[in-house]
Amino acid sequence: KNGLHLWYVVKFDKDMDLNKVALDMSKLSEVATVEYNQVIKRGYDTTKKAKGLNRATREAIQTLGSQTQTENMKLQWGIGNDGSVVTGAVTGYDVNCVPAWEKCQGDPSIIVAVVDEGVMYNHEDLANNMWINPAETFGSDEDADGNGYAGDKYGYNFVAGNGHISYTQTGDTGHATHVAGVIAADNNGIGIRGIAGGDGTPKTGVKIMSCQIFSGEGASSVLNQAKAIKYAADNGAVILQCSWSAASGRINPLMGTPSFTSDEEWSNSVVLQKEALEYFIHNAGDPNGVIDGGIAIFAAGNEYAPMVSYPGAYGDFICVTALDPAGKPSCYTNYVSPSGSKNLIAAPGGDANAFKDEKASILSTMPNSAIEGSDLTASQSGYGYMDGTSMACPHVSGVAALGLSYAAKLRKHYRASDFKDLLLASVRDLSGNLSDEKSYWENWGSVGEAAPHLRMNLPAYRGNIGGLIDAQAVLANIDGSNFGAQPMRVPNVYVALDATETVNLNRIYADNVTATEFNVVDSSIAAVSLDNNQLKVKGTKVGTTKASVTNSDGKTQEFVITVRKATGNGWM
């Protein structure tokens, strides 16, 4: 699908001229595209470590697991901002989770793929909400489930080419672990809580799949990215969390080399990356599940540039800009999209440089090895502060995951494009907060009071950063009937001759609704049984027949059973 099966990796002697090889291959009539396997570097400094949360403060936030906002929750101002986290913070500039949690706090059927460094899968706030491949043994050389990836217990390390997710290599920053905590930290009363991490009881939070494309001090490649994105779609993820990008096409050349400036330029330059992302948005999910397709969410970039970075700039994806605790653009955030900024959403990303206070940054989960300083009281806390559109991005991914969790609870179905539109519409306008100037002190976190005092012209951001994502608005829109929402239906069943397929009706019926009877028009084609809302269909003769199932509400749904002979590795 999307032509990914047509791509081949070509290797040749290192002494051969790369451009000549590409030119010669492009002359072959069978070859449509020749693309270099470009090196991808992280868009952040791998030598810079996060500031840690000390143990005394950590002990003071033990109550953060409570469902309602507490005094201590002010440290997670991106989720619930009461205006007290730092001087100058303004109440309400958050993603408005607290009222949304009264309806839903997450669902384990929703999987978010974190395409990044490796996630610390055994962190005390993440372990219960990691996606787990039950057939696999972590890091094993055996592909126990036959999906083509050995040892992929929590995801896969596409840099090393094995299932060993790593997060303590020299150069690892804790980036992915920080991102994962914002989305799905367990509400267990130990540390922080994530936007869709559940209510603290088992099997209530969304799941994090670690798709590792960065490790240590090394770079990655477009090929690794494409493999990771396809893996996510094929293994159940419906949200792609991508806090990485190319450089902005409008970056100051003194800061870096400008990259793509248009959809056409990006599409023609990294064809494989684009096709992999299209594969995800069109083929993730389930036509009979909560979402048909997937949602790709990208960080806008941190280069102070008047253009967001690709791939996020592309209109098919959601691109996230960053806000500070006063609801103003973070000093570093890129802004403006070639699509007219229609795919932009703003979210809390932090801005310690504007407030001269690390608490204006985003607090989340961290490996101890990625926290700065030799003071073990701080570095062994397991929590730290980071700034960036990288931190804003998981706020949107978390709200999207919370929304899909609520849709699953209501047994509603969306096409991915419709749910993307729902997210883009579920925002609060920021234009009234974008006047005059904003001060910041560049690199205050590194150089302290020696940092130069600079100013931002806020009207330049008006209409160019998107609205602030609002979890309560997302859930309210899901309560409604707009954005293409459809009730989940009993799916058509395709089964091999003499094989059995099971349809879990609990995913389709509301709570406390049970199937009471079924009917198969031609019982010679399929044998059907019903037990505890599990509809089992066994193929007994090649052919097609209509069938129906009736539930305790008296509603009957018709579906079609198709029995075929399996050939080779699938249907022909």
Task: State each model region's role.
Residues 4-7, 26-111, 119-125, 129, ...:
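Protease zymogen maturation seam
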Residues 483-572:
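Extracytoplasmic soluble-region selector
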